[in-house]
Amino acid sequence: MQTISPAFSCDLKSVIQPNLTAKKARYSHVNGKRVSVRCSYRSESFSFPNGVGSSRADWQSSCAILASKVVSAENSSSVAVVNGHSNGSVDLSLVPSKSQHNGKPGLIQPLTITDLSPAPSHGSTLRVAYQGVPGAYSEAAAGKAYPNSEAIPCDQFDVAFQAVELWIADRAVLPVENSLGGSIHRNYDLLLRHRLHIVGEVQIPVHHCLLALPGVRTDCITRVISHPQALAQTEGSLNKLTPKAAIEAFHDTAAAAEYIAANNLHDTAAVASARAAELYGLQILADGIQDDAGNVTRFLMLARDPIIPRTDRPFKTSIVFAAQEHKGTSVLFKVLSAFAFRNISLTKIESRPHQNCPVRVVGDENVGTSKHFEYTFYVDFEASMAEARAQNALAEVQEYTSFLRVLGSYPMDMTPWSTLPSEDV
């Protein structure tokens, strides 16, 4: 199996010296060889409660939002060293700045160069990367998965993966599916591309609120912004609360709340969490506006090293494989039967286009040439890799696959959840 390992690197220079001429992250192409993502923003000076910076740039530095940069493969002469291991494809230009607001530390302490170190020893704070800004549901998931940890917000999903790989973070907590919106395909693709291991899962009830600046009434709202999934999950409530308001998609729920506060928008509301309202000084116009009370998002906990599977509690195992068509017909049926014959329950199966060979051309002298889409399959099943039945099932599955990889064997999240809002969501 050939591992997909593009030359990625993280760069925080755009956070240290932000370009305040753009409104959102933009992509710059340099001679067709390099793509960089700059987090930049236009706004006047402002201040949030709880000591969140005095400008967008200060806030970014305080939160240490990682900016990603794809480095040209031709730049193979520069060799970076991480914990004694050299890697010619990684550029460690990671020098985050320290920022304070009126002499006081910001909401989240910025990264320092000492963060490029091994996993914390006894007594050290665990560093957990998540995608989004403070107040996002991913932050709540990170807090539930690893209480008393140091949360590291990242601007993109793949940056969170890189943060763990480069020892900037010790864990990553990322969403993979929602009970209403379905799978988050981007993260499934990243699980295959990166070599991190699933070490746990956590489920978070999604409790949406309608937020606006203090003093703004619902009938004054002409625009509602939020993440597309949040807007879809609150469509019925928004039609009743703000029937004349325009609905606009935003890249993140908490970032939508931050945007309203930063630009002092009295005609705009955001769909976000109650914590986002607290962080950015907004009022809650309506609480619990999700159309379905059973709205839950499942997050995976990722680490550089796998955990040791056990049998003293319910475990779940996640795998990814590609079927071998030359093994005959009904290959997928044979693969899934390996679990059924051993009384192993499947909790999820997801297909994604094969990254190396998305289309297979088949020629037949009788019917002509046909094209078939090639897929990789992600499967979750309820068994621990410490069990003989799971090992035997995968041994049989391997007979019908061109590649098979165990993404992780980890404890199931068995904690009951409530549709009522929690303190951290």
Swiss-Prot record:
It comes from the Eukaryota. The keyword Zinc does not apply. Its EC number is 4.2.1.91. The keyword Plastid applies. It catalyses: L-arogenate + H(+) = L-phenylalanine + CO2 + H2O. Has no detectable prehenate dehydratase activity. This is Arogenate dehydratase 5, chloroplastic. It comes from Arabidopsis thaliana.
